[in-house]
Amino acid sequence: MSNLSDLIPAGGGQNNTDFVADGTIVSGKPVILTAAGKAAPISTSSSAGTPVSFGSVGTPDYVNVVYDTSANKVVVFWMDYGNSQYGTAAVGTVSGTSISFGTAVVFNSAETTAIAATFDSNANKTVTAYRDGGASNYGKAIVGTVSGTSISFGTEADFNAASTTNIGIGFDSTANKAVIAFRDDGNSDHGTAVVGTVSGTGISFGSETAFQTNQTSSHNLAHDPDENKMVLVYKHDGNSSYGTANVCTITGTSIAFGTDSIFKTANTDNTTVAYDTTANKAVVPYAISGAGKGVVGTVSGTGITFGAEAEFNAGGSSNLACAYNSTGNTTVVSYTEAVTTFDGFAVAGTVSGTSISFGTALNFTGDVTYSSSGQNTIYDPDANKMVSAYRGAGCAVYALDASNLTATNLLGVAAGAISDTATGTINTWGSRNEVQTGLT
């Protein structure tokens, strides 16, 4: 038996059926029906495929990655040391725990650093912001269109006609705008933001607005669709390098800022952010003296408050990135183990109230995973996989704390304990389980 429709009762409470156990089953616990017609305990597991190169090994830097939900493709952006440091992109297709790439395409024929990218789900375009070494290090942005396994680009536009660095980007799906945060080297290193509007294959910008009158870095953004706000996190170099957040409101092509909220009163590195759409919370991972930490933020109006921090890695942690897994309802944090191996690791965080707890980390690659900047981890909702791209020209696909429970395979509840390969009774739908306790 492998079809759950065979178990739907005709109207009685008598549906008790014997099954062979695939794994040890605990009395009173829910079980699934396997493809082999056996009963198995609900469980989670993590696994990673073999990393696949998207460029020449050892030559990429400033690696960034987005997921195109219209084309159902992964798009990786990087600076190619093997090709005059040009800005380059490639389209990837996930299959299982592997990924294949189309031909790499140059989007900027000059030194390209500080790359940050997002996906505009309204225009179905990628938006890539970067520092253009061929144009006085101005801040530029360009729109990409994915077709099959290739990507084409429109004409670049300036978002800051001065030296620009530490670029972060996000998409506001309420206002249908791209939001770029950056350090304006042409204006005393002030933290600055600007709003971009995609039209066709081009992008235009509103006026730049400073959110700090001194130096900032490590900018990242996430959209809060519940409050219709953008959450900006950054390292406030001008204030003892504290980890800081601000809630931004987009109106037309303008951006307004709330009051800063400090989430860590210490030198904070690698600040990043994702939004948990189940818990309706912002999740902010960061590194303190190498240790990987995270906090949960609650947006209210133009302010944000934070719960207690939790640790996901006590050793060296660098190159943090995060993305929300909407199937597993977890925020996955990727990082480089920065003490001995420099391997790539990922860990899933689960939000409860204003707290977050982290599971066991998965070593998704033995390659060196350093990258100078950028959000290099995304969630592919079509394949239900995480994807991390990194400087070693590798791209790893992995499942983290993935459950064997699906929308169609829940079988019932065990009437008693069943040893692996033994036969025992399962109370299927319409039956009554009499071994439950503590349900008053």
Model region roles, listed by residue range:
Residues 1-74, 78-82, 88-95, 113-126, ...:
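Extracellular receptor-binding modules and their adjoining Ser/Thr/Gly/Asp/Asn-rich linkers
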Residues 101-102, 153-154, 205-206, 257-258, ...:
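Blade-edge beta-strand/turn elements of extracellular beta-propeller
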Residues 105-106, 156-157, 208-210, 260-262, ...:
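Terminal edge beta-strands and adjacent linker/stalk segments
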